[in-house]
């Protein structure tokens, strides 16, 4: 019950920040073009700092085993999501089904999951959720691009800022090399920008969307798959495997987001 209250409060906070973005866009104080520039800042700086910060911890056996379990769960959940989208969203003459499949598989977990996890299970949740985000990025840049009809560029995938930040984080975690306090503080401050700025940007983009889309049965179906089918399947599988609560929370929260 306490976790539900904490999550509800955190979701309300996130909606308030989204509302700020919507308000500022309607008042012509933040344009969509400016929001796109902020997106670049998030993807190339703030989110990598969140990932690196999650690895700034002592190396313990329980962290290693937990991270390994989180990797296995993340891989299995993405495979299931891809298969479910292929099965539930059938090809049509128009190309819209490609976007629907992509939307059913890939959430906004890279930005929205971390504040929810930090509020419910602490920094450990963020650490284990990093495993999910790694596979999210890998699948998105390979399967996601193919679904949308594009071609995969291994070089772009390899030099993705989030992939590079995971490599840096793992290096720091396994070597336990000391990080200067000013650098640690800078990473922490930049990572703190991730959630509020991403919510404001979301509000800016929502301000330009027509409400008529809510009457589109295909969009509603895609949203139901994304927000109901995927999380419920994740909960069922993880509980059937008897995973600890802190392992369950991270992937389920990541899967449940829009």
Feature-to-residue mapping (PLM):
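Alpha-helical transmembrane segments of multi-pass small-molecule/ion transporters
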Residues: 1-258
């Amino acid at each position: 019950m306490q976790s539900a209250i904490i999550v509800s409060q955190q979701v309300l906070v996130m909606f308030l920040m989204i509302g700020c973005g919507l308000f500022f866009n309607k008042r012509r104080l933040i344009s969509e073009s400016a929001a796109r520039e902020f997106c670049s800042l998030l993807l190339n700086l703030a989110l990598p700092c969140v990932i690196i910060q999650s690895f700034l911890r002592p190396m313990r056996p329980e962290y290693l085993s937990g991270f390994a379990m989180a990797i296995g769960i993340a891989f299995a959940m993405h495979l299931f999501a891809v298969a479910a989208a292929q099965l539930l969203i059938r090809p049509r003459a128009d190309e819209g089904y490609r976007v629907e499949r992509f939307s059913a598989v890939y959430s906004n977990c890279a930005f929205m999951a971390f504040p929810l996890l930090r509020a419910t299970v602490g920094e450990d949740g963020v650490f284990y959720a990093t495993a999910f985000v790694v596979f999210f990025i890998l699948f998105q840049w390979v399967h996601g691009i193919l679904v949308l009809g594009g071609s995969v560029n291994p070089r772009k995938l390899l030099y993705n800022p989030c992939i590079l930040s995971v490599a840096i984080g793992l290096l720091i975690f396994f070597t336990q090399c000391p990080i200067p306090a000013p650098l640690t503080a800078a990473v922490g401050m930049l990572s703190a920008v991730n959630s509020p700025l991403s919510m404001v940007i979301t509000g800016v983009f929502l301000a330009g969307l027509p409400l008529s889309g809510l009457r589109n049965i295909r969009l509603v179906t895609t949203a139901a798959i994304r927000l109901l089918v995927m999380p419920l399947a994740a909960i069922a599988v993880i509980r059937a495997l008897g995973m600890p609560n802190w392992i369950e929370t991270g992937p389920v929260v990541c899967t449940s987001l829009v």
